[in-house]
């Protein structure tokens, strides 16, 4: 059973991101575009709550149901919401093209109803040695966000 979701990102960064999962246990494909980003890497995460009443700040911390430390998408020890960085070339829209085996659109730990947040700075993937490295990747301000919703198949 294919499941699809969509997220419209608003803020200084804007864009649309699509999620697709072929079935339970299958990886989730994340595709789309984000505009309004300075050249360089920008942290890209799923945060716990689908609440944007106070802008991106009310979306809470990274989605982390297993209480792990922050890490890279390829790390075993990472938040479920840790999707690494997207890379802006400073000229036109920034593509999003991620395939992740830990997030899901199905079951109790589904990311549907949670918030995607784009950050101002690079995510150091938990390896930067900064006091925020193991919680946020020291990725800086939240410059764009949107709630992930169910999409028509």
Curated annotation (Swiss-Prot):
Cofactor: how and how many bound: Binds 1 copper ion per subunit.
EC number: 1.15.1.1
Compartment list: Cytoplasm
Cofactor(s) the protein needs: Cu cation; Zn(2+)
Catalysed conversion reaction: 2 superoxide + 2 H(+) = H2O2 + O2
Keyword Metal-binding: yes
Location, primary (coarse class): cytoplasm
Keyword terms, alphabetized: Antioxidant, Copper, Cytoplasm, Disulfide bond, Metal-binding, Oxidoreductase, Zinc
UniProt KW Zinc keyword: yes
PROSITE patterns associated with the record: SOD_CU_ZN_1, SOD_CU_ZN_2
Positions contributing to Cu cation binding: 45, 47, 62, 119
InterPro entries referenced in this protein's UniProt entry, alphabetically: SOD-like_Cu/Zn_dom_sf, SOD_Cu/Zn_/chaperone, SOD_Cu/Zn_BS, SOD_Cu_Zn_dom
Residues involved in Zn(2+) binding: 62, 70, 79, 82
Record Pfam families: Sod_Cu
Disulfide bridge positions per record: 56-145
GO cellular component, one term: peroxisome
A molecular-function term among this protein's GO annotations: superoxide dismutase activity
Transmembrane regions listed in the UniProt entry: none
Listed GO biological process terms: determination of adult lifespan; positive regulation of mitophagy; regulation of synaptic plasticity
Subunit structure comment from the entry: Homodimer.
Family assignment from sequence similarity: Belongs to the Cu-Zn superoxide dismutase family.
Protein task: Destroys radicals which are normally produced within the cells and which are toxic to biological systems.
Protein name per Swiss-Prot or TrEMBL: Superoxide dismutase [Cu-Zn]
Organism: Drosophila virilis (Fruit fly)
